[in-house]
Swiss-Prot record:
Mg(2+) 2 binds at residues 117, 268. ATP binds at residues 52, 91, 508, 545. The active site is at residues 49, 95. It is an enzyme of class 6 (ligase). One of its GO terms (cellular component) is cytoplasm. It comes from the Bacteria. This is Phosphoribosylformylglycinamidine synthase subunit PurL. Pathway: Purine metabolism; IMP biosynthesis via de novo pathway; 5-amino-1-(5-phospho-D-ribosyl)imidazole from N(2)-formyl-N(1)-(5-phospho-D-ribosyl)glycinamide: step 1/2. It comes from Synechococcus sp. (strain CC9605). The keyword Ligase applies. Keywords: ATP-binding, Cytoplasm, Ligase, Magnesium, Metal-binding, Nucleotide-binding, Purine biosynthesis.
C-alpha cells in the first residue's frame, strides 16, 4: 500500500507546473490519486524539459540515420564513427533559467551536466564549446550576468581539466534578463561497447555512485519549463551547486568501471534527479526498478521522499550492475573518494517502486513517467504571423545611402556580437590535455587532435582530428524562423569546411519562447522544418539535443518579453589530416584572395541580402525585411570545393562570410594576421552597402599562394557551376583597401580596425 497523506491539490499542481487535465490523467493511469511524492515525480517528468511535451512531434521530422551514426536520439548523447577506430560522443544542452537567477552556478553546473552525458556513454570528454546570449552590455545587469556565466563556465571546465575550445556569444535586447547558456561537449569512446541506459537483467543490483544527495536543485526541471519573472530570484534553491574536482574523479572512476564490464546500464542524475534516472532506465529496458531511499547517501538530515526524488544535487550516477559484482564496483568508487551504495534492484514488473522508512513511498508505471508522456496539441498557423508579414514588406532601397564605408565598417567591428571574444576566451583553459589544434578566434571551427585514449590500445596513433562548431544567426531566425534555421545548419557546415573537416552530424539546442501562443508555436515548427530540410540536404543527421522553451521575461507592466527564437546548431566533422587544417588569417603578402559563392555585385540573388543583417540593425536600430533564402545545393557544393582544396594543400587561409558580410570577413582576416589587402570589388548595379555588408550567399573567402595557383585554377575549372571571383591580394602594408571600379571606397589601417575589434567587449565590461 502506497502511503498517501492529504495535501492541497490545487497548490501542489501549481508548484509542479501541472494542469488540472494532467491531474485527471495521472489519476487515470494510477487508478487512484497520487501522493505528494508521486505528484512531484509526474511534475518533473511531464515538464517540457524532460518529456518535450510541446516539441516531440516536431522533432520526429529530423533525419536521424546515416552510415556514420552509431547512436541517435534517445540516449544520453549521440555517437558517430570518425573512422580509424575513433568513435565520438557529443551533445549540447541548455542551462538558461538557472543561469538567469544564479549565473555562476547555473553555468558551471550546465558544464558539469553535459560532461556527464558524455562519459555516461563510456567516452572520455575531450572538449567543450558553448553558445551564449545576453542583453545589451549598456545595462549593468547584463554585464553582471555575463561576468557570472563566463566565470562559471571557466571555473568548471578549467578545474575538471577539459578544454573549452570554441563557441559563440551574441547580444540583443530580447535576451535581457533571460540569457541563454548552451553547453556542448565531445568525448572519445574508451569502451568497446557503448554504454546504454536501459535496465537489463531482473534481480541485477542498482548502485548509486558519486556525491551525496541534498536539497539543492529542488524542482529544477519544472523551474526550467516556466517563464522567468521578478519572483524567479526566489527560486535560487532550484539552482544546483557543482563540484568540478569531484566530477574529475567521477569521470575516471566511471571509465574504469565501464572498462571492467561490470556495469550493464548507466544513467547520470541530471534534471529530475533520481526520479528521471530510475524511470528512464526502467522504461528503456522494459523492466522496473525498486529504489530504497534509506540507502541513498544524504548530506542533510530529515529529507523526505519528495526531496530525495526531486533533488538535483550534482555529480551523481545510477548504475545497473552484474549480480555479484556490486561490492567490487563500489570499492572501486570508494578508492576515488566517492560515495557508492547499493540502493535497489531491477524488477520484472515495469514499475518504479520507491521505499522510504520501510514503507512504499511511491509506485508508478515506468512508462507513465518516461515514455508514454503527454503531448500538447497546438494548431499551426496556416499563414505567417501578421507582424512578420508586415516586416517582410521592407526593401533594401529604404536604407539610407552609404556615405562613409570606413565608419560603417568600424561600427560593425565595434558591435559586441561581431567583435573579438578574447575577453571571454582568455578565461577558458583552451590547451589542457594538449590536443587542441585550433581554438576560438583563430579559425571558423575548433579542431582537436584524436589521440589513443588511456587503456585503449585498439586506436592507433594518427594525424586525425575532430572539428566542432556552434552557430545560430538569431537575427535571421527572428524574421523568418525557417530560413534562419536553414542558415544556422548551413553556417555550421561551412565553418567546418573552412578548416577542412567533413560535416558529419548535428546536435541541436532549440531555445524558444512559450509555445502556447500561436506565433510561438509557429516559430518553433518552422525552425524545426528548416533544420530538417538543411540537415537532409547537407547529409548531417541529428543525433539528439535539447529543447528549452518558455524563454521569456515578465515585464513591470505584466507583459511577456520573448527572446529571439534561437535554434543553436552544434555540428561535428572529421579531419583526416590535422596538418592541413586551415585558419582565417592571411599567411603571406602576395597571396591571391578569392571569393567562393555569390559575387558581391549580384544585386538580385535571393540568397544574399541586407534584411536581418548586422548592418541593417546598426543603421536602422531594428530588424525588418525577409532574410535571404539559403541555397542549400550551392552550400553543399561550396563546402565540397573548399574541403577538396584544403585536402590538396592549396589554400593558405579560409574564412566564411557571416555577420557583417564581406567587408567584416576581410577585416577579420587582416586583424588575425596583421597583414593588409588590396581588393577591387565590382559593384555592377548593386548598392555599395550591399556589396560590402550583405549576408548570406554561401560565401567563403580564401587565399592562395603562387605555388598553388595552377592546381587551384584546375580545381575551380572542374567546378564550373560555382562562382569563384578573384578579389585582389594580400599586402605587406597593413592597410585594408577596398576599391570599386570608380574609386577607393574604404582605406583603413589594420591597426585601427584591430583596436576597435579587440576593445569592444573589454570596454563594455569595464575591464582592461
Amino acid at each position: 500500500m502506497v502511503s498517501s497523506p492529504a495535501y492541497d491539490i490545487a497548490a501542489a499542481l501549481k508548484q509542479e507546473g501541472l494542469k488540472p487535465s494532467d491531474w485527471d490523467e495521472i489519476c487515470r493511469r494510477l487508478g487512484r490519486e497520487p501522493n505528494r511524492a508521486e505528484l512531484g515525480m509526474f511534475g518533473v517528468m511531464w515538464s517540457e524539459h524532460c518529456c518535450y511535451r510541446n516539441s516531440r512531434p516536431l522533432l520526429s521530422g529530423f533525419p536521424t540515420e546515416g552510415p556514420r551514426i552509431l547512436v541517435g536520439p534517445g540516449e544520453n548523447a549521440g555517437v558517430v564513427d570518425l573512422g580509424g577506430g575513433h568513435r565520438l560522443a557529443f551533445k549540447i544542452e541548455s542551462h538558461n533559467h538557472p543561469s538567469a537567477v544564479e549565473p555562476f552556478q547555473g553555468a558551471a553546473t550546465g558544464v558539469g551536466g553535459i560532461l556527464r552525458d558524455i562519459f555516461t556513454m563510456g567516452a572520455r570528454p575531450i572538449a567543450l564549446l558553448n553558445a551564449l546570449r545576453f542583453g545589451p552590455l549598456e545595462d549593468p545587469a547584463n554585464v553582471g550576468l555575463m561576468e557570472g556565466v563566463v566565470a562559471g563556465i571557466a571555473h568548471y571546465g578549467n578545474c575538471v581539466g577539459v578544454p573549452t575550445v570554441g563557441g559563440e556569444v551574441a547580444f540583443d535586447p530580447s535576451y535581457s534578463g533571460n540569457p541563454l547558456v548552451n553547453a556542448m561537449a565531445l568525448g572519445l569512446m574508451e569502451t568497446e561497447e557503448i554504454v546504454k541506459s536501459g535496465a537489463i537483467g531482473v534481480g541485477n543490483p542498482v548502485v548509486y555512485v558519486g556525491s551525496t544527495t541534498g536539497r539543492d536543485g529542488m524542482g529544477g526541471a519544472s523551474f526550467a519549463s516556466a517563464e522567468l519573472s521578478a519572483d524567479s530570484l526566489d527560486d535560487r534553491p532550484a539552482v544546483q551547486v557543482g563540484d568540478p574536482f569531484l566530477e574529475k574523479g567521477l569521470i575516471e572512476a566511471c571509465l574504469e568501471a565501464f572498462a571492467s564490464g561490470d556495469v550493464v546500464a548507466a544513467q547520470d542524475m541530471g534534471a529530475a534527479g533520481l526520479t528521471c534516472s530510475c524511470s528512464e532506465m526502467a522504461a528503456k529496458g522494459g523492466l522496473g526498478v525498486e529504489l530504497d531511499l534509506d540507502r541513498v547517501p544524504a548530506r542533510e538530515t530529515g529529507m523526505t521522499a519528495y526531496e530525495f526524488l526531486l533533488s538535483e544535487s550534482q555529480e551523481r550516477m545510477l548504475f545497473v550492475v552484474k549480480a555479484g559484482r556490486e561490492d567490487a564496483l563500489m570499492q572501486r568508487f570508494r578508492r576515488w573518494g566517492l560515495q557508492a551504495a547499493l540502493v535497489g534492484k531491477v524488477l520484472q514488473e515495469p514499475i518504479v517502486r520507491v521505499l522510504h522508512h520501510g514503507a512504499v513511498a511511491a509506485e508508478v508505471p515506468a512508462t507513465a513517467l518516461a515514455d508514454d508522456t503527454p503531448i500538447e496539441k497546438h494548431a499551426l498557423l496556416q499563414e505567417p504571423p501578421a507582424d512578420l508579414q508586415a516586416l517582410w514588406g521592407w526593401t533594401e532601397q529604404e536604407l539610407p545611402v552609404l556615405s562613409d564605408a570606413a565608419a560603417a565598417l568600424l561600427q560593425l567591428l565595434d558591435d559586441p556580437t561581431i567583435a573579438s571574444k578574447q575577453w571571454v576566451h582568455r578565461q577558458y583553459d583552451q590547451q589542457v590535455l594538449a590536443n587542441t589544434v585550433v581554438s576560438s578566434g583563430a579559425a571558423d571551427a575548433a579542431v582537436v587532435r584524436l589521440r589513443p585514449q588511456q587503456g585503449n590500445g585498439s586506436m592507433a596513433a594518427s594525424n586525425r582530428g575532430v572539428a566542432a562548431t556552434v552557430d545560430c544567426p538569431n537575427r535571421w531566425v527572428a524574421l523568418d524562423p525557417e530560413r534562419g534555421a536553414q542558415a544556422a545548419v548551413a553556417e555550421a557546415a561551412r565553418n567546418l569546411s573552412c578548416v577542412g573537416a567533413e560535416p558529419l552530424a548535428v546536435t541541436d539546442n532549440l531555445n524558444f519562447p512559450s509555445p502556447e501562443t500561436p506565433k510561438g508555436f509557429w516559430q518553433l515548427a518552422m525552425a524545426c522544418r528548416g533544420i530538417s530540410d538543411a540537415c537532409r540536404t547537407l547529409n548531417t543527421p541529428v543525433t539528439g539535443g535539447n529543447v528549452s522553451l518558455y524563454n521569456e521575461t515578465k515585464q513591470d507592466d505584466g507583459t511577456m518579453q520573448p527572446i529571439h527564437p534561437t535554434p543553436v546548431i552544434g555540428m561535428v566533422g572529421g579531419v583526416d589530416d590535422i596538418s592541413r587544417v586551415t585558419c582565417l588569417a592571411w599567411q603571406q603578402p602576395g597571396d591571391a584572395i578569392f571569393l567562393i559563392g555569390v559575387p558581391p555585385e549580384d544585386g538580385a540573388d535571393p540568397s544574399l541580402g541586407l534584411a536581418g543583417s548586422a548592418y541593417q540593425q546598426q543603421t536602422l536600430g531594428s530588424l525588418a525585411g525577409r532574410p535571404p533564402k539559403p541555397d542549400l545545393a550551392i552550400e553543399a557544393a561550396v563546402g565540397s570545393l573548399v574541403r577538396e582544396a584544403i585536402a590538396q594543400g592549396l589554400l593558405a587561409s579560409a574564412h566564411d562570410c557571416s555577420d557583417g558580410g564581406l567587408a567584416v570577413a576581410l577585416a577579420e582576416s587582416c586583424i588575425a594576421s596583421d597583414l593588409g589587402i588590396s581588393v577591387t570589388l565590382s559593384t555592377g548595379s548593386a548598392r555599395l552597402e550591399r556589396v560590402l555588408f550583405a549576408e548570406g550567399g554561401s560565401r567563403v573567402i580564401v587565399s592562395v599562394n603562387a605555388a598553388s595557383f595552377p592546381a587551384w585554377e584546375q580545381l575551380i575549372g572542374s567546378n564550373p557551376a560555382l562562382c569563384v571571383t578573384q578579389l585582389g591580394s594580400v599586402t605587406l602594408e597593413a592597410r585594408l583597401v577596398i576599391r570599386s571600379e570608380s574609386a577607393v571606397q574604404l582605406d583603413l589601417e589594420v591597426e585601427r580596425c584591430a583596436a576597435v575589434f579587440r576593445d569592444a567587449l573589454p570596454r563594455r565590461m569595464h575591464s582592461e
